[in-house]
């Protein structure tokens, strides 16, 4: 997304010197599907024993593939990826572009998820909210919004002398 942001800022600077950006809304107003997943994960964990989660994952493999963005099968697979793990691991797992198996295949070795996501776990544990959704909002604000999204917008806009307000 940094390339598209760069090009957008370049084109915008041709007409204005200050622009209003739209980044950050999902992180502030719980717009991501991961916030819905928190509720579904709790329901699944309360209703279905952990022992049958692998079977559910295999059943999801039967769901037809789709090329559409964030399709039903993808959402189900992501949801199940976080279930059974402590809350501190769920958001990093759901946000990760690849799963544990893909990382292990890439590095040809076993991966400990707590080691892989240690920085995210530390940030999660710093959050003082008790409710999982509120804690996730705080987590997104502290790690994702501050260190990634807004930094990307700031740097790409400043490269073109464009002031972007979020």
Predicted regions and their residues:
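ATP-dependent adenylate-handling active sites, centered on carboxylate activation for C-N bond formation
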Residues: 1-116, 152-166
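General secondary-structure edge motif
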Residues: 69, 124-125, 129
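Structural motif
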Residues: 127-140
